[in-house]
């Protein structure tokens, strides 16, 4: 406990030192602009169409659109360990959006994390990944967003605790952590792999959720795509080894990224938005490239579901977890966990059950999952949450039953683990 306090104090000291240095640098280097003329962008239709495709590949709408709000008008609240950050309006409204931004201003934000007024952005806007974007692609996205309908939606003020609310401190943070490229999590050299690396590491910024983060919120680039719990639902390990260990292979990943339901899993929570707003719109060639990068030029074979120890399996099948499954889950998922195609996910070999960390399974059990529509007219019916029906011990028992019987895991979920997630 004392060590943790010392670590936190050291972190604050580092931040404060960075703030002091940054303020000095900022006074000399940051040339901010306010006011200015409204930009009129008359871009060719082909460039706007290309920009739309790239904006979808970059998943801009997922963050810059609030639930039930206008697309790209901002307002989405993003929770972090440092406070709440609100996504901004990036429609061409001159007063609330980026209507006065030039293409150079837009590029500076994507590449350097600097706003038009010279203030640093927080890395909730993933310039840490977008830094690898080509200028041509940035200009195409700019041409697209400047054709959107201007929305007079005011931006909400970011709410961070001291000293993280001092934006100039981000200059010091950038000096420490901003790099020109993000390491690859797989091995390859083919044209498809190279394109997939750009789609995953730059446009799609997969590492912003799937890469572990350090004490000051920086991506731990020594562990790219190894998984991290940035929010309530964890982003799992999507390295080649991590994907293969849960039964994923190229064909099922292609289907999953294009449709949201494929092979051993279906998308929910934030990943559902990624599928619907972004990866479903990729061309077949880019879909294949993304999969090639995620698995590498020489993909590892998908691991078969390991057989459960007969004694452990017998105990699970005759225990209270099975009783609760039959009472609460079997009506939809079936007694044998086979689910219903395009309606209820199958549990046998399910990717979430095969995760070593039970977090996502427990969150789904406690919170439930709302109805989800997917491309190609597929949809999954709502799953109710059982937080009010299951005690911590019962939820742990049910999770252990599911993981042992259909996930190849050990019955090691404890009641305390459930309690921590309530």
Where are each of the predicted segments found?
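Flexible coil segments in periplasmic/lumen-exposed cytochrome c-class electron-transfer proteins
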Residues: 24, 28-38, 65-84, 116-197, ...
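Asp/Glu-centered strand-loop micro-motifs enriched in Gly/Pro and often flanked by an aromatic residue
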Residues: 36-43, 93-95
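Short extracytoplasmic
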Residues: 42-77
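Short cysteine-rich clusters marking metal-coordination/redox-active sites
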Residues: 60, 206, 329
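C-terminal structural cap/anchor segments
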Residues: 320-360
């Amino acid at each position: 406990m004392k060590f943790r306090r010392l670590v936190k104090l050291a972190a604050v000291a580092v931040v404060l030192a960075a703030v002091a240095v940054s303020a000095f640098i900022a006074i000399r280097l940051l040339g901010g602009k306010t006011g200015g003329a409204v930009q009129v962008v008359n871009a060719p239709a082909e460039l706007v169409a290309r920009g739309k495709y790239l904006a979808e590949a970059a998943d801009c709408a997922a963050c810059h659109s609030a639930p039930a709000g206008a697309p790209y008008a901002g307002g989405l609240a993003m929770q972090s360990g440092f406070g709440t950050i609100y996504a901004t309006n990036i429609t061409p409204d001159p007063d609330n959006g980026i209507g006065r931004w030039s293409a150079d201003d837009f590029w500076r934000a994507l590449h350097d994390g600097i706003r038009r007024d010279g203030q640093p952005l927080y890395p909730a806007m993933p310039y840490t990944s977008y830094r690898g974007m080509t200028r041509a692609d940035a200009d195409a996205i700019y041409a697209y967003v400047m054709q959107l309908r201007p929305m007079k939606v005011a931006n909400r003020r970011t709410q961070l605790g001291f000293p993280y609310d001092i934006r100039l401190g981000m200059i010091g943070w950038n000096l420490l952590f901003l790099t020109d490229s993000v390491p690859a999590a797989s091995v390859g050299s083919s044209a498809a792999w190279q394109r997939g690396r750009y789609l995953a590491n730059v446009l799609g910024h997969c590492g912003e959720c799937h890469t572990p983060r350090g004490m000051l919120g920086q991506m731990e680039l020594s562990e790219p795509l190894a998984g991290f719990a940035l929010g309530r639902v964890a982003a799992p390990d999507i390295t080649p080894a991590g994907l293969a260990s849960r039964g994923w292979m190229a064909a099922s990943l292609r289907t999953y990224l294009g449709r949201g339901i494929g092979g051993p899993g279906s998308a929910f929570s934030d990943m559902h938005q990624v599928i619907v707003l972004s990866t479903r719109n990729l061309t077949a060639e880019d879909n294949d490239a993304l999969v090639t990068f995620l698995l590498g030029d020489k993909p590892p074979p998908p691991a078969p579901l390991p057989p459960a120890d007969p004694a452990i399996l017998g105990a699970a099948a005759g225990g209270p977890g099975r009783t609760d499954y039959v009472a609460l889950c079997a009506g939809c998922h079936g007694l044998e966990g086979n689910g219903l195609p395009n309606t209820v996910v199958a549990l046998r070999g399910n990717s979430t059950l095969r995760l070593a960390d039970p977090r996502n399974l427990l969150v789904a059990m406690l919170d439930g999952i709302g109805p989800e529509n997917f491309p190609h007219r597929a949809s999954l019916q709502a799953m109710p949450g059982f937080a009010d029906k299951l005690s911590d011990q019962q939820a742990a028992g049910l999770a252990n039953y599911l993981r042992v019987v259909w996930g190849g895991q050990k019955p090691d979920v404890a009641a305390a683990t459930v309690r921590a997630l309530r």
